[in-house]
Amino acid sequence: MVDAWGSELSQALSSIGPNSDILRQRLIVEFQFGPNQTLRFDKTLTGLDLDSGQQQRALLRRLEWAIGRLDIKKIEKSMPAVGMNIASCIKGTRSIDEVAAFPGKITIVGGKLRHHETPSFGASNHLASILIQAHTMNDAKTAIINLKPTMKDGKADLGKIKQTCEELGYSFAKCVKGKITGSHSRLDILLDEGDFGWEPSLYILAHNPLELIDRTHQICSQIGD
């Protein structure tokens, strides 16, 4: 029920767009056990009610929920040999210590996603650094995941990746050894083609961790065709 509700909310929020500010949030949950046995919780928050600590805790919960929504069947071919990670930040973040991610790496073991610890701030350096760079250019993007790009003749298939971006309406940019090249007002997909001793990586960016999962499934399905 929670997943279905979350999916509907995510789709509705995506249609509104990332530039809208929340003025009020109202959450109503009701359980009825019998004619005279009803539990009802009705909570209203304004957009100013969340302090920084609450925002950070909410972000960590979103990361936990996001990893639970990843479909292994859709992403297993895009799993990097070194494992993947998901990172996210609060809008306006400029320090990697303020970026939340999973300590270590997320891997597939026995057909299930495995991560050793719950997400925490300052747990990532490389992925957090790329997110900070992207967020500085395109501040609406606050979430990122790293994947293995589709390969051709031992190299990242640049043509296939660009074609996928065009078909899905996503912007495309490159990074070299973790440094985004050029200046961009919009960033959706980043490709690091790799080098000697440096594994090629595909980075997907989104407005939040939940949208990131939807984009990841969409792109992995498209590239895998």
What residue spans do the PLM features occupy?
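Conserved mixed alpha/beta catalytic, RNA-binding, or beta-rich assembly cores of soluble enzyme
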Residues: M1-S15, D21-R26, Q32-D225
